[in-house]
C-alpha cells in the first residue's frame, strides 16, 4: 500500500477520533445539538468510507454501504455483531441526513454514547 493510501486511512481515522472524542451526550442548546448531529454524521461517513477502502484494498468490488460492511465482516473474520452495529450506525447516519421530526432527533441523541463506543471499537 502506498503512502498516499495510508495517509487517507489515517485522515479518516483522525477525523473520527477528533470529532467524537469530546462529543457531549446531551446538548445544552440548539447550536450544540447541531454540532453533535454533524459530528456523528461525518464520523459515520468516515467509518463507511474506511469500510469501502478496506473492501477495495482487499480486491473485492465496492458495492453499496450495507453490502460492503457484510463483505468486510466476512473477509476479515470480524464478529457478525460488529457488522450489524456498523449497519445500524449507517442507518442512523441516514436519519441524520434526512431528519424529519423531533422524535428522530431524540433517537439520535439517545444513540450518541453507543455510536461513540462503536466507532472507537471500529478504528
Give the ranges of each region predicted by the language model.
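Solvent-exposed interaction patches of small proteins and small membrane subunits
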Residues: 1-123
